[in-house]
Amino acid sequence: MREKIRLVSSAKTGHFYTTTKNKRLHPEKIEIKKFDPVVRKHVVYKEAKIK
């Protein structure tokens, strides 16, 4: 089953994206480069739990 996750910016701006992932096939945490509109740069986003 796909679970909702939150991708939090490593630039400490508080910006985040939400997405889903299949935890059975990919149990490791996601790290992906995406655009952060607050600092207007591409930064690494790391997986975090949705509260």
From Swiss-Prot:
Q: Does the keyword Ribonucleoprotein apply?
A: yes
| Pfam families (UniProt xref) | Ribosomal_L33 (PF00471)
Q: Which GO terms describe its cellular component?
A: cytosolic large ribosomal subunit
Gene Ontology BP, a term: translation
**Single Gene Ontology MF annotation:** structural constituent of ribosome
Q: Which UniProt keywords apply?
A: Ribonucleoprotein, Ribosomal protein
Gene3D superfamilies linked to this entry: Ribosomal protein L33 (2.20.28.120)
* NCBIfam families from the UniProt entry: PRK00595.1, rpmG_bact
For this chain, the family text in UniProt reads: Belongs to the bacterial ribosomal protein bL33 family.
PANTHER family per the record? Answer: 54S RIBOSOMAL PROTEIN L39, MITOCHONDRIAL, LARGE RIBOSOMAL SUBUNIT PROTEIN BL33M
Q: Which HAMAP family match?
A: Ribosomal_bL33 (MF_00294)
Q: What is the name attached to this protein's record?
A: Large ribosomal subunit protein bL33
